[in-house]
Amino acid sequence: RVEEVTVCDAATVARGRAWRTPVLYKVAVPGRHFAINAMGVLAVTHALGLDRALAVTALGQWQAGAGRGLREVIVLDKVEPHLTLDLIDDAYNANPASLGAALEVLAGARPKDGLGRVSHGRRIAYLGDMKELGREEQALHRALATRPGMERIDIVHCVGPLMRELWRSLPERQRGHWCEDSASMAARVAHDLDAGDVVLVKGSLSMGLGRVVDAIRKMGHGPATV
């Protein structure tokens, strides 16, 4: 079981117990949920009789894939390569638990001040509808406004009719744009983002938030770095 998790800027370190002994491991991406999933990997390793030390080493090099929490540094100016923003591409799916975990990661991120025209870095979220939640879908979207860590996010942009429930529930200071579809939101990103920002993009796959991710990548000069 996982007993302690420390989320750092570029990694997550966890302590727990497995096979009746203490275990210490890390994953090369921030996120409490990644550490919990990693303990499951170690349990499978043990069940299959594989090398635990080798598994721990591999976890220390593991990074999230595209659409599932991949972090990229987008260089915004080829003349001044220090002008960057950080992108968290989590656009493949969304439900209340996974979105809450992603918001926790964003809330703990460190924007960079003094880089762009806004002068201070911001935590910005682009959130699309969470699908297939049944009768409580509107209430579950509204409830995101009071999730732990939400108060640390500077601007929340919302996509889709269900996320409009969240948009209406947010304080005025956090309320960004609301758009019916991802294409409309993607057309705005170049005007809304600046150097120093940390940006999360997340929504159910059918909402097409990958368009927003692509629009952010197109702001870059040269290949993005992970």
Where are these regions (language model features)?
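Short, surface-exposed loop motifs enriched in S/T, G, D/E and P with embedded aromatic residues
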Residues: V2, Y25
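A short, compositionally biased
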Residues: V7-V13
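ATP-dependent carboxylate-amine ligase
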Residues: A10, R20, K26-H33, M39-V226
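Short amphipathic beta-strand and strand-loop transition segments with alternating hydrophobic
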Residues: E3-T6, R71
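A generic structural motif
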Residues: R15-R17
